[in-house]
Swiss-Prot record:
V region of the variable domain of T cell receptor (TR) alpha chain that participates in the antigen recognition. Alpha-beta T cell receptors are antigen specific receptors which are essential to the immune response and are present on the cell surface of T lymphocytes. Recognize peptide-major histocompatibility (MH) (pMH) complexes that are displayed by antigen presenting cells (APC), a prerequisite for efficient T cell adaptive immunity against pathogens. GO terms for biological process: adaptive immune response. This is T cell receptor alpha variable 40. Glycans are attached at N39.
Length: 105
């Protein structure tokens, strides 16, 4: 049985200045069992740390990943040096419905 899931990706900037910005994928609806890629691109004048957080309904924020120049190759699909860091969820379930945040620190 396929049911639709709503993923809401909010654009948010952490510790930002006018020279730092983050752009994320907007709201995404996918079928249960499908894969989804949530994109995060950024501009920064320095060497940032990029964070992905998730907020499930009625739950506090949870850290999904922390990415720096040193460890950016450890995460699938992205490279902080290329100023993008997508996150991929495979075989999405209804329980994955949440707000996903990409933050630049």
């Amino acid at each position: 049985m396929n049911s639709s899931l709503d993923f809401l990706i909010l654009i948010l900037m952490f510790g930002g200045t006018s020279s730092n910005s983050v752009k994320q994928t907007g709201q995404i609806t996918v079928s249960e069992g499908a894969s989804v890629t949530m994109n995060c691109t950024y501009t920064s004048t320095g060497y940032p740390t990029l964070f992905w957080y998730v907020e499930y309904p009625s739950k506090p924020l949870q850290l999904l990943q922390r990415e720096t120049m040193e460890n950016s190759k450890n995460f699938g699909g992205g490279n902080i040096k290329d100023k993008n860091s997508p996150i991929v969820k495979y075989s999405v379930q209804v329980s994955d419905s949440a707000v996903y945040y990409c933050l630049l620190g």
